[in-house]
Amino acid sequence: MADDMVYQEAVAAEVIQINGRTGVTGEIFQVRCKILGGKDTGRILTRNVKGPVKLGDFIMLRETEREAKQLGKRRK
């Protein structure tokens, strides 16, 4: 049943830059992605992505309104 799930509201985006890693163990990547469809076509967003990701990957976004906060500098 889970295989039949289709996100009709999802929009494709292409990863154009990887800004860094975040999360307690570094499992979240912060990426800049270019929206490829919908009303925000061509817009570039900063998003947090869980899991392995590389330049040129396509990700599906359920919404394109929110943008991730920029990563802060690491404290020593």
From Swiss-Prot:
It holds the Pfam family Ribosomal_S28e. SUPFAM superfamilies: Nucleic acid-binding proteins. GO terms for cellular component: cytosolic small ribosomal subunit. One of its GO terms (biological process) is maturation of SSU-rRNA. GO terms for molecular function: structural constituent of ribosome. PANTHER family: 40S RIBOSOMAL PROTEIN S28, SMALL RIBOSOMAL SUBUNIT PROTEIN ES28. This is Small ribosomal subunit protein eS28. NCBIfam families: PRK04007.1. Belongs to the eukaryotic ribosomal protein eS28 family. Keywords: Ribonucleoprotein, Ribosomal protein. The keyword Ribosomal protein applies. The keyword Ribosomal protein applies. The gene is rps28e. It comes from the Archaea. InterPro entries: NA-bd_OB-fold, Ribosomal_eS28, Ribosomal_eS28_CS. CDD domains: S1_S28E (cd04457).
